[in-house]
């Protein structure tokens, strides 16, 4: 399956990885824009405050993101056949267009390519997943990334205390 990357674990075991090129790059751009809007209104917030407060709203959004659809492809995405990035937000005139649904749609969009790869592993290869161990910036805002990923994958997601530090932290510990 060309959608799946074969990589080695630190102890040399070969594993299949559902790799995504785009994760939260589009979300990052929107958070920056919303921060600029807040600043234009006289509110000053750190990047951490913006992420924690704005991403938290996603947990109050509608399960279907209010009918909002986000394709956060800043760059191409091999797993879904896109050679170039074209970020897109689409909605109908009767969508429930709220901040919570906007943020929620972008968080789910960040996981779409990975979910496509998981579907290949689960359906075509018969792989089984008992738990996902989350790490990286997607998990820095308390609870949000963990709950969104669990909903997107239908799998429990656990985090270590250092989850927000990502893979580089683990590699540093192994060195």
Give each language-model segment a name:
Residues 1-133, 138-175:
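Active-site core segments that coordinate phosphate-bearing ligands/cofactors
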């Amino acid at each position: 399956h060309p959608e799946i990357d074969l990589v080695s674990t630190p102890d040399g075991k070969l594993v299949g990885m559902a790799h995504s090129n785009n994760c939260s790059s589009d979300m990052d751009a929107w958070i920056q824009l919303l921060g600029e809007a807040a600043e234009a209104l006289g509110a000053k917030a750190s990047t951490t405050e913006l992420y924690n407060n704005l991403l938290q709203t996603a947990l109050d959004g509608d399960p279907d993101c209010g009918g909002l659809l986000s394709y956060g492809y800043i760059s191409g995405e091999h797993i879904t056949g896109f050679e170039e990035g074209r970020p897109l937000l689409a909605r109908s005139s009767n969508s429930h267009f709220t901040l919570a649904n906007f943020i929620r749609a972008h968080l789910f969009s960040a996981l779409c390519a990975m979910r496509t790869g998981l579907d290949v592993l689960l359906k075509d290869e018969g792989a089984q997943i008992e738990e996902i161990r989350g790490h990286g910036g997607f998990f820095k805002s308390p609870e949000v990334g963990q709950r969104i990923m669990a909903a997107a994958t239908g799998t429990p997601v656990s985090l270590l205390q250092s989850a927000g530090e990502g893979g580089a932290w683990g590699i540093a510990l192994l060195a």
